[in-house]
C-alpha cells in the first residue's frame, strides 16, 4: 500500500456548491463537522502545514467547499462547518441542502471524516451527516477532537460511548480520538486515508466529461 505524503497537499479551489466543483473523477475524502469542532486544525495537523486550512475567527462565515490535492486524482475536501447558532436560518437550510446534495451525488466522494468535539459528540447534524454517508455507501471515520481536554478515563468512556452509539447506523463507521494540540490520533487518520485512497476505485472521466 502506498503511503501518501500529506505534507505535499496543496489548495486547488473553493466552490460555493457542487455545480462549481471540478469534474467528478478520482477519489475524494471530505472533512465535515460543526463550526467549532476543530476541522481546520485537524487538516493543518494532518498535512503539517500551519495555514493550509484557514481557521476562521468567525465560525460559520465561510460557506465554501475547499478542495485540496494530496496526489494526482486524490483530493481532500473541506466542507463548511455546520450548526453555528448565529448564521441566519435561511442560510443554514441552503447549506444543509448543498451538503446533502454533495454527499448524495458526488460519485468521487468515497470517504467522510466527521469531526466532533469529544465533550459534545453526536449532535443532530452530526448524526444526519453519518446517516447521509451510510445511505450513500460512503465509509465514515468519526474523529473525537480536542481529546486533550479530557482526562484519560473520561476520554476512554466517551470513545466507548460513541463507538456503541454508531453501531445503530449499520454502516462502515470507525471512531477514534484526536488532538491537534498533542498530535494524538494523527497516525490513525493517515492510515485510514491511505487505505481509502489506495483501495477505493477511482471514478474515471466519462466521454462527455460529465
From Swiss-Prot:
Gene3D superfamilies: P-loop containing nucleotide triphosphate hydrolases. Disulfide bonds: none annotated. One of its GO terms (cellular component) is cytosol. It holds the Pfam family MMR_HSR1. GTP binds at residues 33-40, 60-64, 78-81, 145-148, 178-180. Keywords: Cell cycle, Cell division, GTP-binding, Magnesium, Metal-binding, Nucleotide-binding, Septation. Its cofactor is Mg(2+). NCBIfam families: GTPase_YsxC (TIGR03598). Necessary for normal cell division and for the maintenance of normal septation. Belongs to the TRAFAC class TrmE-Era-EngA-EngB-Septin-like GTPase superfamily. EngB GTPase family. GO terms for molecular function: GTP binding; metal ion binding. GO terms for biological process: division septum assembly. It comes from the Bacteria. The lineage of its organism: Bacteria, Pseudomonadati, Pseudomonadota, Gammaproteobacteria, Enterobacterales. Mg(2+) binds at residues 40, 62. This is Probable GTP-binding protein EngB.
Amino acid at each position: 500500500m502506498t503511503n501518501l505524503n500529506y505534507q505535499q497537499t496543496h489548495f486547488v479551489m473553493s466552490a460555493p456548491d457542487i455545480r462549481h466543483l471540478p469534474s467528478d473523477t478520482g477519489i475524494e475524502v471530505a472533512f465535515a463537522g460543526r463550526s467549532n469542532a476543530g476541522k481546520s486544525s485537524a487538516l493543518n495537523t494532518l498535512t503539517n502545514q500551519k495555514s493550509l486550512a484557514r481557521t476562521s475567527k468567525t465560525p460559520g462565515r465561510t460557506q465554501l467547499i475547499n478542495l485540496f490535492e494530496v496526489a494526482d486524482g486524490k483530493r481532500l475536501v473541506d466542507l463548511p462547518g455546520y450548526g453555528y447558532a448565529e448564521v441566519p436560518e435561511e442560510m443554514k437550510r441552503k447549506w444543509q441542502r448543498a451538503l446533502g446534495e454533495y454527499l448524495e451525488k458526488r460519485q468521487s466522494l468515497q470517504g467522510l471524516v466527521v469531526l466532533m468535539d469529544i465533550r459534545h459528540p453526536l449532535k443532530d447534524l452530526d448524526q444526519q451527516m453519518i446517516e447521509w454517508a451510510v445511505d450513500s455507501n460512503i465509509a465514515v471515520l468519526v474523529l473525537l477532537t480536542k481529546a486533550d481536554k479530557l482526562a484519560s478515563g473520561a476520554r476512554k468512556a466517551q470513545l466507548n460511548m460513541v463507538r456503541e452509539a454508531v453501531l445503530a447506523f449499520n454502516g462502515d463507521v470507525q471512531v477514534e480520538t484526536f488532538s491537534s494540540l498533542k498530535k494524538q490520533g494523527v497516525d490513525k487518520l493517515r492510515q485510514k486515508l491511505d487505505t481509502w485512497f489506495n483501495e477505493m476505485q477511482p471514478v474515471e472521466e466519462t466521454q462527455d466529461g460529465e
